Every structure is written in C-alpha cells, then in structure tokens.
C-alpha cells in the first residue's frame, strides 16, 4: 500500500512540478500584468545588451574598434590578435571572426525580439493608467531602431555608395517566422519610423532628453 501511495503522490504532483517556471522566468500573462512587469522586461533587454557580444564590449570598444583600426597591441594574446587582424582587413568571412559575428547578429536580434514582445503586449494597455507605460513603449521602439541601425551599419553596404543595395531583415513581430529583408533605403526608413514613434512616446521624458535637437538633426539628415 505504501508503494502505491507513493506512486499516486508522485504522479499527482507531476503536473504541478512541470508548471514550475525556471528561475528568472515568468509566464507571459504574469510578466505583463502590470507596469512593473514591463519595466522588468526592459531591464532584461538592457541586461542582454550589456553582454560582451553587444555593448558590453563588441559594439562599444571591441569589434567596432577593430574595424576602425583603433585597436592593435603587439602584446595582445595571439588568439585575439588574429581576430583583430581579420577585422582590420574587413574579412567578415574569416573563420576566426565567425563566432563573434554570429554572436553579435544573434544576440542583437534576440533583443529586438524581446522589444517586439513588449510592444505587442503594451498595445493592449491603456497608457493613461500609468505614465511609465508610454515611456516604456518609447524605449522599446528606440531599442528596436538602435539595434537595427547598428546591424545595418556593420553588415550592409554604405547607402551613399550603393543606395539600391539590399539591407537586413527588419523584425516587427515576436515570433519565429523568417523576417522580411528590406532594401537599404527601406531599412533606414524603418529605423526612422521607429525613432519617430519613440520620440512621440517619450515627449514627456524630460529627464533623459531635455532637447530634441539631436534627433531632429538625424531625421533631417535621413
């Protein structure tokens, strides 16, 4: 009887065991049930953007400096030196850069996907309930624009030299479907569109952006 009781208890507890979320994760309905959930989602995006494959190194002072030939040290470890030399010569297909470039591309689109998840869920929210909703929405648009812009400038042609060239996939939705690849001009237009939406949402955010002169200049240049 004891054995059967133990088996019944184990099987009965199976469903509740499987319902337990991994540490640091929440079901989507719970994640976005209040403004704090949206804040936490944005914190998660920023934490991912701070990884060494993105703005924690590669897109701040690592890979981008190698491309600009601003980083060369004869005392650098040999395994890193071959990466630097390949980047100095813009050899994107060099096997030594394959892992790093794959990480930049993959992590950036992961963050874009997270931003899209925030944007899709926040569409169901009454923004008047809390002023932070509009700010969060603006931040998500800004993140999406910024990441696409950096991918475009790193992995696409110079629009001034090749205006009709192909651009990059521009991700608007939180799903696993293949994303549409836009032309270079269309890609930049998409970025400017997201920046315009971000600016409208952040119009009351005077703490971080007391002047719109910089963004107005960039849009005018586009």
Where do the language-model regions lie?
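Secretory-pathway/luminal and periplasmic proteins that interact with or process carbohydrate-rich
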Residues: 50-55, 73-76, 147-157
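Sec-dependent bacterial lipoprotein signal peptides
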Residues: 1-12
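Inward-facing hydrophobic residues that define packing positions of alpha-helical scaffold repeats
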Residues: 42, 112-115, 188, 195
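Membrane-proximal, proline-rich intrinsically disordered regions
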Residues: 14-64
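Generic helix N-cap/helix-start motif at coil->alpha-helix transitions
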Residues: 217-220
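Conserved, well-structured interaction surfaces
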Residues: 80-155, 182, 197-210, 214
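Short coil/linker segments at helix-helix boundaries
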Residues: 131, 154-189
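A structural signal for short, hydrophobic/glycine-enriched beta-strand patches
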Residues: 23, 63-96, 172-173, 222
């Amino acid at each position: 009887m004891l054995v059967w009781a133990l088996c019944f208890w184990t099987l009965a507890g199976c469903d509740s065991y499987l319902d337990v979320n991994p540490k640091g994760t929440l079901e989507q309905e719970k994640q976005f049930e209040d403004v704090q959930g949206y804040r936490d989602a944005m914190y998660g995006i920023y934490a991912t953007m701070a990884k060494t494959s993105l703005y924690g190194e590669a897109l701040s002072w690592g890979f981008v400096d190698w491309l600009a030939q601003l980083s060369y040290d004869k005392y650098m470890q040999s395994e890193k030196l071959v990466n630097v030399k390949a980047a100095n010569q813009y050899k994107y297909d060099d096997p030594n850069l394959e892992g790093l470039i794959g990480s930049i591309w993959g992590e950036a689109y992961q963050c874009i996907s997270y931003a899209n998840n925030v944007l899709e869920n926040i569409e169901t929210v009454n923004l008047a309930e809390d002023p932070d909703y509009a700010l969060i929405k603006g931040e998500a648009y800004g993140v999406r624009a910024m990441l696409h812009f950096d991918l475009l400038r790193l992995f696409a042609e110079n629009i001034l030299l090749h205006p009709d060239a192909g651009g990059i996939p521009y991700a608007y939705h939180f799903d696993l479907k293949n994303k549409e690849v836009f032309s270079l001009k269309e890609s930049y237009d998409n970025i400017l569109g997201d920046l315009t939406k971000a600016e409208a949402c952040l119009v009351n955010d005077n703490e971080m952006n007391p002047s719109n002169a910089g963004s107005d200049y960039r849009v005018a240049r586009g």
